[in-house]
Design a protein with these regions (language model features):
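Hydrophobic cores of alpha-helical transmembrane segments in multi-pass integral membrane proteins
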Residues: 10-41, 46-82, 87-114, 128-151, ...
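Membrane-interface helix termini and inter-helical loops of multi-pass transporters
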Residues: 116-119, 271-275, 355-360
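Fe-S ferredoxin-like electron-transfer domains
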Residues: 122-124, 128
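Membrane-interfacial, low-structure loops and terminal tails that flank and connect transmembrane helices
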Residues: 1, 156-161, 307-325, 478-506
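Generic start-of-chain signal for non-secretory N-termini
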Residues: 1-12
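Intrinsically disordered, low-complexity regulatory regions of eukaryotic signaling and scaffold proteins
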Residues: 65, 275-278
Length: 541
């Protein structure tokens, strides 16, 4: 990427993402302090739930959406070696998303949208929150369109050639996001906004939760696919080796996109509006989608072993010590995989019908998704930033040693934060509470774990500040010499000359997704329009 305008587009998206991230980190530390009860002066349910809602929206929607858009533009231009298709439209999408973010932030920060990032109805937020969230998503749809167009144009210009793996993964993510965002869009447009404007008096919460379930689990893969992309296209090269298999990587992204969509009812296991058969179907699908994660773990570790042995590693495990641990990308993937293993185990518990009943609505649940998202996913966002930031600003990274310290402290802080969070869930602490106003032997047993969480949160906050400082210094430092480093994508150990169309495109898989979505969500949604709901029609009018 040599065009200054395109680099500016990428950097603008990434800066919005990371500034939202660091604000959310400060809010997160306040929350563990407030909930612990150690500082009574901080206790305020109003401020707490405004903080939790803002923290969740900034992390789950703003950080991820802007990062994925910026990273996607970078991948598209550097892997396809073409400029962004319609850069004016790309900027339009950016400004629409930014406008939506600001619109949603005002009611969040003023306590008029304390509905958490899931905003389950019939709890209401100010209408500007819903309109802002809608604009954020609409701006991201512009990005999806640009990715799909660039993918199609490249295939048309290079018939029979394998699409670069990085672009294949990015396009899979754009396709997944277009499908999965439809659920929340329907909820907001036909239920939340009309209710907030007073156009309707009531809504069916069961339909609202079903529509949000359409989005709630696949959005995790929308967040995760950029991390997996780095696993496959950056890590092997940075480690000094080769990608174990290009074809396996493509299959993993296809399974994530296809089978990651028609699931989500494990979030509704305790809800009465869906029958147990549909929950079982979605539960089975949830276990199916764990397969690409297992495949990814195998492929990435195999690629690392190739690199370690090429660097002189001997014996069964000697290759591990031969890896370049001082490389931020390599260190990040090792730490990310460790957190993914533990977080994946928690995900299996959540997806299991019986075990889910034990931990449903307990502190276990936020412990789990912080380990998967803020752990595995975000640490790879750091790694990607450390790798591409010098390429974007044409200056060397300010401090590689600071980057390594930041990655280790993020891993340590996340471990200290989420381990007691899981334990508190097993001890029965409910989630979504601002404080504990009663003292029993059980609640007193929670105190040591809450103290540990405060300590872990402080480490994470310091780590986040180090990250932002390193990027800012990299960009603001004067250039002392010409920067010539170029992006390097990993090559497979067996070069790919040609691929079957089902591993090089999405026409077939888009049709499969349509069929699976109709099976998984058709009857569960349509039932609300045909069954008696006792005065609460599906859309509310």
């Amino acid at each position: 990427m040599n065009d200054a305008a395109e680099r500016k587009l990428v950097l603008s998206n990434l800066w919005v993402a990371f500034l939202a991230f660091v604000v959310a980190c400060f809010l997160g530390e306040y929350q563990v302090l407030e909930r612990s009860g150690f500082i009574p002066a901080l206790e305020s349910p109003t401020v707490y739930f405004a903080s939790v809602s803002t923290h969740g929206v900034l992390m789950a929607f703003v950080l991820t959406t802007f990062f994925i858009m910026g990273f996607g533009y970078y991948i598209a231009t550097t892997s396809l070696k073409v400029p962004v298709w319609n850069i004016k439209l790309a900027w339009c999408g950016f400004w629409v998303s930014l406008l939506g973010t600001v619109m949603a932030a005002v009611p969040l920060l003023t306590g008029n949208a304390s509905v958490l990032y899931t905003f389950y109805l019939p709890i209401q937020a100010h209408v500007s929150f819903y309109i802002g969230a809608t604009l954020l998503v609409v701006g991201s749809w512009v990005w999806c369109l640009i990715m799909l167009v660039m993918f199609g144009q490249w295939k048309q210009a290079n018939p029979g050639q394998p699409v670069p793996l990085a672009m294949f993964a990015t396009t899979a993510n754009a396709l997944l996001w277009l499908w999965t965002s439809v659920g929340v869009a329907l909820e907001v447009l036909f239920q939340a906004i009309p209710l907030a404007l007073g156009w309707i008096d009531t809504v069916d919460p069961g339909l609202a939760r079903t529509l949000f379930a359409w989005t709630l689990h696949p959005i995790v893969y929308f967040w995760l696919i950029p991390a997996y992309t780095a696993f496959y296209v950056f890590v092997p090269k940075q480690a000094g080796g080769f990608l174990f298999s290009d074809e396996i990587a493509r299959a993993a992204f296809i399974v994530l996109a296809v089978f990651g969509l028609p699931i989500g009812f494990h979030h509704l296991y305790m809800d009465p509006e869906q029958a147990s058969g549909w929950k079982l179907l979605h539960g089975v699908g949830t276990f199916v989608v764990s397969l690409p994660t297992l495949v990814t773990g195998f492929t990435v570790i195999a690629s690392l072993e190739i690199a370690g042995r090429l660097r002189g590693g001997k014996g069964l495990f000697g290759w591990i010590g031969s890896l370049p641990w001082s490389n931020s990308m390599v260190l990040s993937v090792i730490l990310a995989l460790l957190m993914l293993i533990l977080g994946g185990f928690g995900g299996v518990v959540n997806a299991s019908y019986a075990m889910n009943a034990m931990i449903h609505n307990t502190a276990w649940v936020p412990g789990h998704f912080h380990l998967i998202f803020a752990g595995t996913t975000v640490i790879m966002y750091f790694a990607i930033a450390y790798y591409i930031w010098p390429l974007l600003v044409k200056k060397p990274l300010f401090s590689n040693s600071m980057a390594l310290i930041q990655l280790w402290t993020w891993f340590i802080g996340m471990s200290i934060l989420t381990t007691p969070w899981h334990v508190l869930g097993l001890l029965g602490q409910p989630r979504r509470i601002s404080s504990v106003v009663y003292n029993t032997l059980l609640t007193l047993a929670w105190k040591p774990y809450e103290l540990a969480m405060i300590f872990g949160g402080l480490i994470l906050l310091g780590s986040a500040c180090l990250f932002i400082y390193n990027l800012a210094k990299t960009q603001l430092n004067p250039a002392t010499e010409e920067f010539t480093q170029q992006i390097e994508y990993a090559e497979p150990i067996h070069p790919v000359k040609a691929l079957p169309e089902y591993l090089n495109g999405f026409k077939l898989w888009n049709r499969v997704i349509a069929v699976l979505m109709a099976i998984s969500f058709g009857v569960p949604i349509l039932q609300f329009f045909f069954m008696e709901t006792f005065g609460s029609p599906a859309w509310g009018y």
